[in-house]
Structures are given as C-alpha cells and as structure tokens.
Swiss-Prot record:
SMART domains, per database record: Ribosomal_S4, S4
Subunit structure comment from the entry: Part of the 30S ribosomal subunit. Contacts protein S5. The interaction surface between S4 and S5 is involved in control of translational fidelity.
Biological process, per Gene Ontology: ribosomal small subunit biogenesis; translation
Naturally occurring in which organism (per UniProt): Clostridium perfringens (strain SM101 / Type A)
One GO MF term: structural constituent of ribosome
Domain S4 RNA-binding: 98-163
Function: One of the primary rRNA binding proteins, it binds directly to 16S rRNA where it nucleates assembly of the body of the 30S subunit. With S5 and S12 plays an important role in translational accuracy.
Protein name according to UniProt: Small ribosomal subunit protein uS4A
Classification of source organism: Bacteria, Bacillati, Bacillota, Clostridia, Eubacteriales
Amino acid sequence: MARYTGATCKLCRREGMKLFLKGDRCYTDKCAFVRRSYAPGQHGASRKKLSNYGTQLREKQKAKRIYGVLEGQFRNTYERAEKMRGIAGENLLKLLEMRLDNVVYRLGYGASRTEARQLVNHGHFLVNGKKVDIASFKVSVNDVITVCEKSRGSERFKMFAENPKALPKWLEANVENFEGKVIAEPAREDIDVPVNETLIVELYSK
C-alpha cells in the first residue's frame, strides 16, 4: 500500500500548526515546529494569504496528514460519508475515527497514529478474536480489539499497559486484559482534531 515516506515534521510546518504526528516528541523542545514554525522551502517564512480554494485545500491536507491517509483513500472515505445519513463533514470524521489504526491509537497502544498503524500492520491485534492487519479496517460498535497473546509480553505493550491514557467517551478499555471495546459511534464533540470539516465538504462540492 502506498504511504507517505517524507519528513514528518515538514507536514506540521506546512500546515502552520502542530499535528502531533510524532507522539511524545511533539511535546518537547526537540519538535521541529518549535524551532521553525514557518513552512518548509526557500520562501516558507513569508506566508501568502490564501484564497478560499487554498484555505479549503489546506484543511483537507491537514485532515489527511493527521489520520495518515492518502488522497485516494480520503476521497473514497468522503464519498462514503456523503451517502450516509446526517452531515457529510461529521460523517467523514467519524469514519476516519473508526479506522482500526486510529482506534488502536485512541486506546493508548501507540504514541502516535503512525506507530499505531505500524503495530496493526505487523499483526499485533485481534478484532472480535480474529487477527486484522489492515490499518484502514473499519471497526463497528460492540467490536472488541485485543492485543495478540504473543505480543503482550513485549516491553512496548507492557509500557502501554502501565501508562494508560484517557479514553474518548465512545471507547472503553480493560487494561489488565489488553482489551478495548467500541461502545458507541464518536460524536463530533468527542473528536478532538483541529479540523474544520465544513471547508472539506465545500472543496469536494465544487
């Protein structure tokens, strides 16, 4: 599967804000955005005023980068969101939140979505008792996500278990059993990403 292989910190600088793509490092002075908060490139320090289209495009790019999704997948996800009941923009964010890699990240198994995606791809998780190694797999309400038995002894997973993170309302976890459960669909107020989804809808509606 295609994926972005460039410098992660440049993505935050391009969007003009921290996207927290590197987990704990983003909270330290080592974060590249702290040292250089302007866009990369020769003329990055002098930001031009964006047109309406440019603003909408930047918002889409920001959402793609936060969730680690490339254009084709993002477009397909939007088209699914558009066909669902409700508000297309909110549906889009809900679908992105319900990706397995994001759920693993929200459960605390990964300092970043990138790390969570790698853990999924390497086959460390079961969904309802069956191994799933596809990061884009869409989980559903009442699905149970479990760390594989053979992975639980690793220092990485022990560390995650010893330092549980606060969960969104739509998830619950049993840390001792290395298990999490989707108990509801995420509401918009439960999704803490700095994205104005209305601008994305406007962009795709043209």
